Amino acid sequence: MDEDFAFLDTFKNDVLDDYLARGWYRSLHVGCMFTTDNILINDTAYPVYWIRYNVPSVVLSRKQKSLINAVRKRYSISFEPFRIDDEIERIFKLYKSVATFLKNDTLRHIFGFDVTTFDTEVIKIRDNNELIAAGSFDIGMNSIAGVMNFYDPAYKKYSLGKYLVV
């Protein structure tokens, strides 16, 4: 299993763009970038399929456009710098209760305490003033990379996880 890691003080702007263009991705736990062709799960190697989109060339389906419009009409959407606080930890804890694949108990365990290595933003979805979903992503000069999305399971039928990906 070939894998490489890059440790820098920051992965921002054109540095992040360069690493993403070469097939590198963020490692959450240690604030570095990595690339690999396989991952090991329970002593079995599985191939990794890195997904990238040239955003300007993406054509949304009618169903995706409908989802975007429905979420925008029903909820308020905001973008801001990513910070781990009690509000966002609450949503993560609710999501973790149904997302059995998540091993870490808190976002602080996943991201660590230093959230300055990357220029990370968060999209927040609110029902009135209550946070119901969040999606974090790193920003370069010409690229973005999704990091993690989570939502209140009580809102599952509204496809907020899909909205955050689209």
Place the predicted regions along the sequence by residue.
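Short alpha-helical interface elements
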Residues: L40-T44, T116-T117, K162
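Acyl-donor-binding surface of acyltransferase catalytic domains
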Residues: D2-S76
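Generic detection of long, well-ordered alpha-helical segments
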Residues: F5-T10, P81-E89, K162
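A conserved beta-strand-loop-helix scaffold within acyl/acetyltransferase catalytic domains
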Residues: M33-N38, N54-K157
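Conserved acetyl-CoA-binding loop-helix of GNAT-fold acetyltransferases
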Residues: K157-V166
